[in-house]
């Protein structure tokens, strides 16, 4: 699978098979994370590999996401925020988030290449994770990746069409209206999601108000 196809088809598993994930594959995934771009080349990221069922259950409880217990392997992505702050200054947290996001994307891409599926979990109980896994004060968990062989085929999430999110020279100048015959994939995709539903609601409300006036 080439990089473009991997990016377009990347999705999160819904249910994990109990087949073990080979450590050779885990190592390759971690190498991808280790080589992520880093602001100022600080290289703030660190990783904890979790395999024990009891430990995975802790992650599931802290995050409210049962997939982290189902998946045979989880990786806690950490950032040494103190190290980043010394180099970057007050914007250190944004820099750590950027580095972590870049690492996670690369790790998930390699996981897909290796025939695995993954999920990226944030919004968990930070203190529970720090306490449960002995993480020091200057290091912050940025997210958790679950790795598995999926129990069923993983479908990528729906995306906005390119003409809804790509503009030319100025905002709202849709790129498809500028380049006649442009053959970019996704250019003619239209997705029935939030913005369009909001627009429909607005016009229906406007019609009702017109009837009342």
Predicted regions, residues:
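Acidic, surface-exposed loops and disordered segments
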Residues: 1-213
